[in-house]
Regions:
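Positively charged, small/polar-rich N-terminal and surface patches that mediate targeting and assembly
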Residues: 1-121
């Protein structure tokens, strides 16, 4: 059995009404080192129920790569800056991936914790 250390990261999925707002949020997160990288996908169609009506809107989606534990700070920041009353913010924790990328994200965001990853070889 091989035991390898892997940096912990989180992926934060978030939407914004425009590419301009998404870019402003992404820039602030990367500049403050709350995020190592943010991908922005524009012109995504969203259908949702709001106050009893089905709405359809175009949105930009952000996929934010951050260090473990920083998603709470990201959520706090975004809730203050976002134009939506109830912004979509979802956190995912990858269990596998490129160890070098995980370490890069941890380094950029100043996260030093690692986890043990036990694998059968």
């Amino acid at each position: 059995m091989e035991c390898e250390k892997k940096a912990q990261i989180e992926l934060v999925y978030m939407t914004a009404p425009t590419k301009i707002e998404a870019r402003a949020i992404a820039h602030a997160l990367v500049a403050s080192k709350l995020a190592a990288c943010v991908n922005i996908f524009q012109e995504v169609e969203a259908l949702y129920n709001w106050e009893g009506d089905v709405k359809t809107e175009k949105e930009s989606v952000m996929l934010i790569k951050t260090g473990m534990g920083l998603s709470r700070k990201i959520t706090e920041f975004v809730k203050k800056e976002h134009s939506y009353e109830c912004p979509c913010i979802m956190v995912m924790r990858p269990t596998d991936g490129n160890k070098d990328f995980f370490e890069w994200v941890a380094k950029i965001t100043n996260v030093t914790e690692v986890i043990s990853d036990h694998r059968m070889t």
